[in-house]
A protein has these predicted regions:
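Accessory interaction regions appended to the cores of large information-processing enzymes
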Residues: 1-127
Length: 127
């Protein structure tokens, strides 16, 4: 099983950030998707969870402005059915269903909550 790419920020996802992140796994969202801290935005190519910032934008220089964005080709996001989403999640993750979308998220939205959950799970396995 692969790990999750977890958003560390809340806001609209940027093309530049997603373009950089797609090298590290497959994305579940497209640019301008509203994301929140703790939301799973993709699947990591490795089997560890990764905290990522999908809001990071390119630093614009005076002359080269946003015209270069056309060169950033994004792989279309992987859209999941409810069944696929339920199959994909681990014990520490939830599927969030609204009339418009199916989203994945961590139970603990903040990094320290996720670390605490992981520590408790490891200590349970040791007992």
């Amino acid at each position: 099983a692969n790990g999750a790419m977890i958003s560390t920020e809340t806001g609209g996802a940027m093309t530049y950030a997603l373009w950089n992140l797609q090298e590290r796994g497959s994305l579940f969202i497209s640019p301008q998707t509203e994301v929140y801290e703790g939301m799973i935005i993709g699947e990591s190519a490795r089997n560890v969870d990764m905290d990522v910032n999908p809001l990071k934008n390119k630093k614009l220089t005076a002359i080269r402005s946003s015209g270069n964005d056309e060169a950033m080709r994004l792989t279309p996001p992987r859209e999941m059915t409810l069944e696929e989403a339920l199959e994909w999640i681990n014990d520490d993750e939830l599927v969030e269903i609204t009339p418009d979308s199916i989203r994945l998220r961590k139970k603990g939205l903040k990094p320290h909550e996720r670390r605490q959950y992981y520590r408790e799970r490891v200590s349970d396995e040791v007992k």
